[in-house]
A protein has these predicted regions:
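Structured catalytic-domain cores with a bias toward divalent-metal coordination
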Residues: 1-502
Length: 502
């Protein structure tokens, strides 16, 4: 049963292979079935031909069950087969491969239960690409090296990828990095993918799994894509089998690295530093389309080429913060606590009231989009002020220590300005709205007393009035300036229910 399998997985090296998170991209389902058929036909061996113990291999046949049931042959306009497939969106029309940190779906909670029960050393997410036309059937996305621990960076990029490239070549396939175009065509170069925690592989990387997204080419025939996916699977199984002890050791070292992190970097930006890579593509041109009358991009498969193109693969963090001893999350934030719990985050729940001096986050500004993204109006360009204050802690509030295996997940979700933090995903929007105001005709009679009791405010007010004509001519602006700095102003406005202790 599954419990025994999970126990066995925790005791050894484990691979988790995910399929059909986008059910219109079903190559991995068939590849896994073929692998299992072959394994059964061979007598269900538990060792490789060289006598090495096989890892525990767990398959998710179809992550997006709702999308799988929405069948058609038309939702993938640019894809070459199969005859029928599912739909990208879930029953609630979520792209579930954007849901791994915000966890809007039950799928994400179920996945977290599976993932943390297995604690996979290797995670594979099978997909089919969109984009340019080129000769490769099989491409891959590896986790962004700059966000990884030094141990997993070295293991992935210096050992695993070269091994996979050579292994699938023996099976007749070229393995190439995912063709994420820098411009309109490959001639302008390709760039490394930023696997944020919203994505399956980015999420898995937070827990130090070797993480890959397999991307077969949409225009290649379906049977060919399935065989290429199978070749990658066999390659990663072979690598994991041969290098099991090193993988286990490097992951343990990576967890220790994360527990002892002093500085957390985030908001990674792609640089203009370019390497070069040999690329097998097709010549392209821009003839006029007979219907639209406009220039169209066309690839000519009768004119294949192999040439060097730019490869942009270096990211640098725009921001970094010191790692606190622990975070405090208000006990009223049950949605946050549920997600921390689901991801095996360790925390202490307070049973009595107390007062502590904590590092407080106050939102100064942010941008909200005009259109929703995956069920949210995701915040960006967040500016946060920080200060030390005495905070009344209540029973039910939780203390989340940074020194634990889930450290990267904790920082990614609780640091307000991190790319996929819970603040950006609107978990704390209620704190961004003011709840109380004042009436001018009443409050104007109180300002003399407020200013008399606060000489610094009096000085700031007079300076603003002397230097800002708009302010000087607006009763509301003047009264609000004083009100927002007075004891009457609500303390919860723009102040997050997350604190830090250093």
């Amino acid at each position: 049963d599954s419990t025994r399998t999970f126990a066995k997985a925790l005791a050894g090296t484990t691979i988790l292979i995910n399929n059909a998170i986008h059910p219109g991209e079903p190559d991995g389902i068939n590849a896994c079935l073929i692998w299992l058929d072959q394994w059964i036909a061979q007598g269900k061996p538990l060792e490789s031909k060289n006598g090495d113990k096989l890892p525990v291999i767990a398959f998710i046949p179809a992550y997006n069950v709702g999308g799988m049931m929405n069948r058609s042959s038309t939702s993938r306009a640019n894809q070459n087969g199969p005859e029928e497939y599912g739909f990208r969106g879930s029953t609630r029309n979520f792209d579930l491969n954007r849901d791994f940190i915000k966890m809007d779906s039950k799928n994400a909670f179920t996945f977290a239960k599976i993932f943390h029960s297995l604690d996979p050393d290797v995670f594979i997410d099978n997909h089919v690409s969109n984009g340019a036309d080129y000769q490769y059937t099989l491409t891959y996305i590896a986790s962004m090296k700059e966000r990884m621990s030094p141990q997993m960076n070295e293991l992935t990029y210096e050992k695993c990828i070269p091994y996979l490239t050579a292994n699938v070549k023996q099976h007749g396939w070229d393995l190439f990095p995912y063709v994420e175009l820098k411009g309109e065509t490959p001639a302008q170069g390709i760039h490394a993918f930023n696997d944020l925690p919203r994505y399956a592989m980015g999420y898995a990387s937070l827990f130090h799994s070797i993480s890959f997204t397999v991307e077969t080419h949409m225009l290649k025939p379906f049977p060919q894509r399935v065989q290429a996916t199978l070749a990658f699977m066999e390659g990663i199984i072979s690598f994991t089998t041969v290098n099991a002890l090193e993988i286990e050791a490097k992951r343990s070292a990576a967890k220790l690295w994360a527990r002892n992190l002093h500085q957390y970097a985030f908001n990674y930006q792609l640089t203009e530093k370019a390497d070069s890579i040999s690329f097998k593509g097709y010549e392209h041109s821009f003839p006029l389309h007979p219907i639209t009358g406009l220039k169209e991009l066309t690839y000519d498969r009768t004119k294949p080429y192999e040439r060097m193109i730019p490869w942009f693969k270096t990211y640098i963090p725009k921001d970094s913060v010191s790692v606190p001893e622990y975070y405090v999350v208000g006990g009223q934030e049950q949605e946050v606590i549920d997600r921390l719990t689901a991801n095996h985050v360790l925390f202490e729940t307070l049973t009595s009231a107390s007062i502590d001096t904590l590092h407080v986050f106050s939102v100064k500004s942010y941008k909200s989009p005009a259109q929703p993204y995956e069920g949210h109006f995701k915040l960006s360009q967040i500016e946060v002020g920080e200060s030390e204050r005495a905070i009344d802690l209540k029973p039910g509030d939780i203390l989340v220590p940074s020194q634990q295996d889930a450290a990267l997940f904790i920082h990614a979700s609780l640091q307000p300005r991190a790319e996929d933090s819970y603040l950006t995903w609107n978990f704390f929007d209620s704190y961004l709205q003011q709840k109380e105001y004042f009436s001018n005709y009443v409050f104007k009679d109180q300002i003399a007393d407020i200013l008399a009791k606060n000489p610094q405010l009096q000085e700031e007010y007079q300076l603003r009035k002397a230097t800002d004509e708009k302010f000087r001519n607006s009763e509301w602006d003047q009264l609000y300036f004083i009100y927002s700095r007075s004891p009457y102003f609500e303390q919860t406005f723009m102040r997050l229910p997350i604190y830090q202790k250093f």
